[in-house]
Design a protein with these regions (language model features):
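Non-catalytic, conformational "gating/processing" segments within enzyme and secreted inhibitor domains
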Residues: 1-117
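Flexible, low-complexity segments enriched for small/polar residues
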Residues: 96, 100, 104-144, 149-334
């Protein structure tokens, strides 16, 4: 992998493999011997029973003592303990030149945009290697404070601050768990998590239950009918898209069950005296002030169409919240 995240190719234009099956086996051997933590009052055995309260423990007699050839030809000598082999194997991966662009690219996709430019990835990868960014960081390789600062303060990330400078590939779809959490958090909701978790699960993302060790969606997923990457769109179907809409509908107009409480009183009070100001406040809260004039006019028209009555102001606030939080402009995070 090049420092900008693009693949290195051989003379025939094929990607150059980073590792072989033999190296995968060597890493597996380096990790042998580790088992579940011992339960209180128990005794460490070769295969401890499932117990999750604590770090894994090493049963040394179950560790492979042979030599292991890892990435870049690094050899772990025979006879090392399981703890030393584990640390050396992790160091071998951490110091591989592919790691900075690989990790940087994935972090950018999760935090800023599904389609970072190679130059963006390269800038962040360089910070990963140096461990410092504009005075932030320890100077050690992989310093996450420096890396995250470089990601969020990069010009390619900050151009989204001004809708006029944004481009079509900016941003990324909020994955279900973050979509649900962000809506709840925006309005100060409290919850036992039951119904919100059900909604996220029905959107295709059951918390802590990824279908594989490679996360809920692949980083190289291309949105059908386009050439754009959109990892989170791998979970998006007609059915899950409707679940998103139904979630916001229940949140705004009814409830998410007895375990979740929220109040829209602040916005209802604003709607009772100035519906336009209420829409503007929600624009600032949910869209950071990026709502277009056309969208504002349409939402305000829907708000003003709510018939007069005892609950008019509340329904006006709920209508605006529903329309904004279910919109593509909100669901795609910029």
């Amino acid at each position: 992998m090049n420092n900008d995240g693009t693949l290195q190719l051989d003379g025939n234009g094929n990607p150059i493999p980073t590792y072989t099956q033999a190296q995968v086996t060597a890493f597996a051997n380096a990790y042998t011997g580790w088992t579940y933590p011992t339960e209180p009052g128990g005794t460490l055995v070769k295969h401890n029973p499932q117990y999750f309260l604590g770090p894994m423990e090493l049963f040394e007699n179950n560790h492979d003592l042979g030599s292991k050839t890892l990435l870049l030809g690094t050899v772990l000598p025979a006879g090392q303990t399981g703890t030393v082999d584990l640390q050396d194997a992790l160091d071998n991966i951490f110091n591989h030149p592919n790691l900075p662009p690989f990790v940087s690219g994935l972090l950018i996709q999760h935090l800023v945009t599904s389609n970072p430019s190679p130059a963006y990835v390269s800038r962040v990868a360089n910070v990963f290697e140096s461990g410092t960014f504009q005075g932030i960081g320890s100077g050690q390789r992989g310093d996450m404070q420096a890396v995250i600062a470089a990601i969020l303060l990069d010009p390619e990330a900050r151009r989204g601050d001004n809708p006029a400078t944004a481009v079509a590939t900016d941003g990324h779809l909020r994955e279900p768990i973050l979509y649900v959490a962000n809506v709840l958090r925006a309005f100060g909701a409290t919850t036992d998590g039951a119904q919100p978790v059900n909604y996220a699960t029905n959107m295709g993302q059951a918390p802590m239950r990824s279908g594989s060790v490679f996360n809920f969606f692949p980083p190289n997923y291309i949105i059908p009918g386009t050439t754009m990457l959109g990892p989170e769109f791998d979970l998006q179907t007609t059915a899950t898209a409707l679940v998103r809409i139904n979630f916001v509908n229940s949140f705004a107009f009814s409830s998410l069950g007895a375990g979740t409480t929220v109040s829209f009183g602040t916005y209802a009070n604003m709607a009772s005296s100035n519906p336009g100001a209420m829409v503007d406040a929600l624009n600032a809260l949910l869209l950071h002030g990026t709502m277009s004039a056309t969208d504002r006019a349409d939402i305000l028209a829907a708000v003003n169409a709510v018939p007069a009555g005892t609950n008019q102001a509340t329904l006006q606030a709920e209508t605006a919240i529903y329309l904004i939080a279910s919109s593509s402009q909100y669901q795609v995070m910029h």
